[in-house]
Amino acid sequence: MPIEPGQEVIFVVPIRKIKKRVPRWKRAPRAAKFVREWIARHAKAEEVKLEPAVNEKLWERGAEKPPNKLRVKVVVEVVDGKRVAKVSLA
């Protein structure tokens, strides 16, 4: 069941899934991309916008050690007929 526009939902994104598949020095950039893909799939959104705080949390311990999971709040809005998911820290 997709998220209704304007509804707030809290997700826990399992970043650990990609940590062993990516070289150590690429982990934080790949984690940011994974968060976008995961939210797009689960929120049924065509576009995903991450707040700067989410990116800072991913990079907090450097490129090699992103967190294993990330708790985020997602709000879906319809802009010009496209579903846009806005992601912030929960």
Curated annotation (Swiss-Prot):
Q: Which SMART domains match?
A: Ribosomal_L31e (SM01380)
Does the UniProt entry include the keyword Ligase? no
Pfam families membership: Ribosomal_L31e
List all membrane-crossing ranges. Answer: none
Which residues fall in a coiled-coil region? none
One GO term under biological process is:
translation
Please list the GO terms describing molecular function.
structural constituent of ribosome
Q: Recite the UniProt keywords alphabetically.
A: Ribonucleoprotein, Ribosomal protein
* Gene Ontology CC terms, in alphabetical order: ribonucleoprotein complex; ribosome
What does the similarity note say?
Belongs to the eukaryotic ribosomal protein eL31 family.
* Name this polypeptide is given: Large ribosomal subunit protein eL31
What is the organism field in this record? Answer: Thermococcus gammatolerans (strain DSM 15229 / JCM 11827 / EJ3)
